[in-house]
Every structure is written in C-alpha cells, then in structure tokens.
C-alpha cells in the first residue's frame, strides 16, 4: 500500500483518544511520563492514528499527531458507510464493522467512534469484541478498514465486470 502524504490532504482534524500517565520506578522514587493516543483524519476517506510519549501532556500529543500523519490509510466508502462487513483484529482486540442504512449514524464505542468519524463514515454499526484497551481497539479498527475492498477491485481480481459482481 502506498504512503499517503498528509501535506496533500489539506486540513486534518485531530482527536485525542486517551492520555495515560506511566511511571518508571527508580532508586529515588517514581519518574512520571505521559502517553497520548491521537487519531487524525480529513473526514473524506483518510484516517490515521499515532502514539506519543513525553514528560508533559502537550508534547506527548504533538508527537502523537506527527506519528499519526505518517500512518494515514485510505478507507473505501459507499455513500456514508462501508462497502461490506469486516472483522478487524489486533492482539486480543476485535472489532466488527457492519454497513448501515442512511440515517443510522455512527454506532460505536469511544476509540472506535473517533476512527470511524474522522474517516468520514456517517452510517455504521460496530461491536467491539475481546479486549477493550483503547490502543488495541484503534489498531483493530484501522486494520479492519484497510481490509475493505471496492467493488471495482473485487471485479478486477475475479476477472468480471462490476455489473456481474453486483448481480
């Protein structure tokens, strides 16, 4: 899959999913740092996520945004939903993403909702299965979205026309 240049997409919207304080125990006590999980997207079929770690929260968020812009993926959409049902997996986290009729809205939990909304999906059903750790849910969602295929791609793979595929 080719890399998407964030500079060519224009304005990307950022959403902080989680901020976590982590500690390193040393001889003199605990050293605290912050990790941030951020999702970025243009609400037009491009979305990415990133993580950052720093001694201060704003620095962690800035690093996470930079990381997210390097990890953008393209999401195929049909109207405001996905072309077909997909199951995304990462670690113990699983997410079921199911197309929905117009007017349904985004039915998804916190981290998954952030990814789907910033990808530009307006009508979707989802169910998180397994682990509910935010980073695993985000990774599973993005992994599932990358598995989506357009009708044109499926037709080309099977050596058929789009009309034959659609029935």
Swiss-Prot record:
One of its GO terms (biological process) is translation. Keywords: Ribonucleoprotein, Ribosomal protein, RNA-binding, rRNA-binding. GO terms for molecular function: rRNA binding; structural constituent of ribosome. One of its GO terms (cellular component) is small ribosomal subunit. The N-terminal domain interacts with the head of the 30S subunit; the C-terminal domain interacts with the body and contacts protein S4. The interaction surface between S4 and S5 is involved in control of translational fidelity. Belongs to the universal ribosomal protein uS5 family. This is Small ribosomal subunit protein uS5. It comes from Lysinibacillus sphaericus (strain C3-41).
């Amino acid at each position: 899959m080719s890399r998407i240049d964030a500079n060519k997409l224009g304005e990307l919207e950022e959403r902080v999913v989680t901020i976590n304080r982590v500690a390193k125990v040393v001889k003199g006590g605990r050293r605290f740092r912050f990790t941030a999980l951020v999702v970025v997207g243009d609400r037009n079929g491009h979305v990415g996520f990133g993580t950052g770690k720093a001694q201060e929260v704003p620095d962690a968020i800035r690093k996470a945004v930079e990381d997210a812009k390097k990890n953008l993926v393209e999401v195929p959409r049909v109207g405001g939903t996905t072309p077909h049902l997909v199951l995304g997996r990462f670690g113990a986290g699983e997410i079921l993403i199911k197309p929905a009729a117009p007017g349904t809205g985004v039915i998804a939990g916190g981290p998954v909702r952030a990814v789907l909304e910033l990808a530009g999906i307006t009508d979707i059903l989802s169910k998180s299965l397994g682990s509910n750790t935010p980073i695993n849910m985000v990774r599973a969602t993005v992994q599932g979205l990358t598995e989506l295929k357009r009708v044109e791609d499926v037709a080309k793979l099977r050596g058929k026309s789009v009309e034959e595929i659609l029935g």
